[in-house]
């Protein structure tokens, strides 16, 4: 059982919901990434999603696009991202870390080389936005052989066939994108999310995390009632954008602690 699987199983056994915050590696500054990772855990995160900066992040809204631009301007590469995970692992060997990004940086490195380097760094899974499950069977299999989980996206427009492909090739959890659009968009319809997740669960036996559009404790709590975990990204990046550099880590920890409290009530 992978670290992601055991974490989510332990939460389910306690009737608790997973909290999965997202930050972009290297934003707002490379030296803050590892302190932010630890602060998110201290605030109650169960799994961390670390975004790999990319110049054309097509699924992201303007907030995460800006985060990618800032990280790239600091020269953050895939090598650096794996270095952040290695540094984090020196003092935390229990919280799963998922890398989220796009195929290009992985292809540049080479799939096998990336997987071995990610395993050595202490990565637990990947979400590659432009790797549909039916096109990356070998990548998914190699990840699993190395005790990492290939995590795939599902959306309101996913076909039955796509859902079955995710059930076949995915592991760890499935990531349901709650909105038609980009990250950070507004107004989640929790009734619609509940209906879609019920349809997905006919095929997918993995835990389901929901992201895109979760901006506050009330929305997180509502979404958690129909899912296994909530993913929050753009709202955290906004907190970083609006915080003086010296207060950024503390403010993010306070924000995520508020979400944790709401999920546990």
From Swiss-Prot:
Pathway: Amino-acid biosynthesis; L-tryptophan biosynthesis; L-tryptophan from chorismate: step 5/5. InterPro entries: Aldolase_TIM, RibuloseP-bd_barrel, Trp_synthase_alpha_AS, Trp_synthase_suA. Belongs to the TrpA family. NCBIfam families: trpA. Tetramer of two alpha and two beta chains. This is Tryptophan synthase alpha chain. PANTHER family: TRYPTOPHAN SYNTHASE ALPHA CHAIN, CHLOROPLASTIC (PTHR43406:SF1), TRYPTOPHAN SYNTHASE, ALPHA CHAIN (PTHR43406). The alpha subunit is responsible for the aldol cleavage of indoleglycerol phosphate to indole and glyceraldehyde 3-phosphate. It catalyses: (1S,2R)-1-C-(indol-3-yl)glycerol 3-phosphate + L-serine = D-glyceraldehyde 3-phosphate + L-tryptophan + H2O. It is an enzyme of class 4 (lyase). The active site is at 49 (proton acceptor), 60 (proton acceptor). GO terms for molecular function: tryptophan synthase activity. Its EC number is 4.2.1.20. The keyword Amino-acid biosynthesis applies. It comes from Janthinobacterium sp. (strain Marseille). GO terms for cellular component: cytosol. SUPFAM superfamilies: Ribulose-phoshate binding barrel (SSF51366). Keywords: Amino-acid biosynthesis, Aromatic amino acid biosynthesis, Lyase, Tryptophan biosynthesis. It holds the Pfam family Trp_syntA.
